């Protein structure tokens, strides 16, 4: 344990907390414009064509966001809303597109977990 004299000379260092979503600037969501919509392949044990898009945010950042759900209507110049949340098997993808907000439509024929995919209740 440090003595009082040692602490006077050099105070204790604070633990640095890493920010996993720096582009959001402490906001819950951010708006952006799609620059490029494309598919990528995941890391080693998995195999698929994951839908992602490159987004230029309102604060000037340019990030890659994952488009969840089956099918989407996004193309270049679509205005979307992104949230934090990484995709474990896609390196460099730390954001998710919010379905059912702005230009991004909700997932068609979704009956369970609708709130995550921007689908209204079926009558």
Swiss-Prot record:
**Repeat listed as a keyword:** no
Q: Name one GO biological process term.
A: translation
Q: Which InterPro entries match?
A: NA-bd_OB-fold (IPR012340), Ribosomal_uS12 (IPR006032), Ribosomal_uS12_bac (IPR005679)
Q: Which UniProt keywords are listed?
A: Methylation, Ribonucleoprotein, Ribosomal protein, RNA-binding, rRNA-binding, tRNA-binding
Pfam families, alphabetized: Ribosom_S12_S23
By its UniProt entry, which Gene3D superfamilies does this protein fall under?
Nucleic acid-binding proteins
Question: GO molecular-function annotation terms?
Answer: rRNA binding; structural constituent of ribosome; tRNA binding
Q: Which GO terms describe its cellular component?
A: small ribosomal subunit
Q: Which residues carry this modification: 3-methylthioaspartic acid?
A: 89
Protein family per UniProt: Belongs to the universal ribosomal protein uS12 family.
Q: What does this protein do?
A: With S4 and S5 plays an important role in translational accuracy.
What's the subunit arrangement here?
A: Part of the 30S ribosomal subunit. Contacts proteins S8 and S17. May interact with IF1 in the 30S initiation complex.
Protein name, per record: Small ribosomal subunit protein uS12
**From which organism does this entry originate?**
Buchnera aphidicola subsp. Baizongia pistaciae (strain Bp)
């Amino acid at each position: 344990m440090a003595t009082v004299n040692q602490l006077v000379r050099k105070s204790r260092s604070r633990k640095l907390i890493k920010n996993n979503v720096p582009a959001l600037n402490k906001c819950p969501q951010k708006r952006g414009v799609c620059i490029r919509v494309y598919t990528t392949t995941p890391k080693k044990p998995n195999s698929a064509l994951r839908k992602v898009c490159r987004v230029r945010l309102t604060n000037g950042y340019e990030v890659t966001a994952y488009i969840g759900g089956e099918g989407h209507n996004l193309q270049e110049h679509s205005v979307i809303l992104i949230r934090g949340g990484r995709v474990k098997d896609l390196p460099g993808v730390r954001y998710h597109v919010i379905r059912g907000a702005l230009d991004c439509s909700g997932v068609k024929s979704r009956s369970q977990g609708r709130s995550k995919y921007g689908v209204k209740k079926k009558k």
